[in-house]
């Protein structure tokens, strides 16, 4: 099972003939290989990343719903620690 947070694509790069997305979540950027996707990824898209590969492109609506759920979880965990 994979738990992935939607990341917003801020850059598309090409290295050694392979396309990668640079995606960001809360200021943290990571590089994801795009070879597993059958859909073209654009700057501004939201993707799910696992082990360095983009697994899925999400609609903005789905990404925002998921991000809201993650924020609720983080807030609940923070409250439990206090």
From Swiss-Prot:
One of its GO terms (biological process) is protein maturation. One of its GO terms (molecular function) is iron ion binding. InterPro entries: Hydgase_assmbl_chp_CS (IPR019812), Hydrogenase_HupF/HypC (IPR001109). Disulfide bonds: none annotated. It comes from the Archaea. Belongs to the HupF/HypC family. This is Uncharacterized hydrogenase expression/formation protein MJ0200.
